[in-house]
Amino acid sequence: MISKIVKKIKQRKLIIRNMRDINSLIRTEVKIEQLQYMALNSDRPLIADECQLGSPVIVSLTTFSKKIHEVHLAIESIAQQSVRPDKIILWLDEDEFAMENIPSILIKQINRGLEVKFFSNIKSYKKIVPTLIIFPDSYIITIDDDVLYANNMIDILVKEQNRFPKMIIGHRGHRMTFDGANLPKPYKQWDYDV
């Protein structure tokens, strides 16, 4: 009798967990559709009308050929922030891209304030190194090309930067882990989202 009750409880927990997963997937798909619609149809600038802090807030990202047709969604999620950045810069590999082969949806975003720049292929460092060189006194937020950001991310980062002005502020990070010889383990073995 007790084992049947325990089994039923486990089944219900599994159903509830599956329902949460389905709800999460639906919310994500709805958000993607909304961002896609905005990217295709909006004339609203992606960036702030005027600098809101003492130094510009710059969102910097990079992508590559396999993700070039989806990166507009991450960019659009930044454009929908409660606090919009002063610049959004998409860095592309100068050997892989030219303005002539950029997808038309990114051209629409360029017309709304996106800046596309080209740099040598230094992998993911491309989203921070050239931006630091050109804008050393700015607040730089690096983002991933495959994440849809909550609409208050920049607001939270700016508030935390104001609280801790001499610190590097992160929205999400990973903790390096080390092996027995005190050498860093491979990236995939780090502690994620700490």
Predicted segments — roles?
Residues 91-138:
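Active-site-proximal specificity loops/subdomain of glycosyltransferases
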Residues 2-80:
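N-proximal low-complexity "stem/linker" segments adjacent to membrane-targeting elements
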Residues 75-86, 94, 108:
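Short, acidic, metal-binding catalytic loop of nucleotide-sugar glycosyltransferases
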Residues 137-148:
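Short beta-strand-to-loop acidic/aromatic patch adjacent to the donor-nucleotide binding site
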Residues 56, 86-87, 139:
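Residues at the starts of beta-strands that form the adenosine-phosphate
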Residues 59-61, 90, 142:
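Structural beta-sheet core signal
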Residues 131, 148-194:
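Conserved catalytic core of nucleotide-sugar-dependent glycosyltransferases
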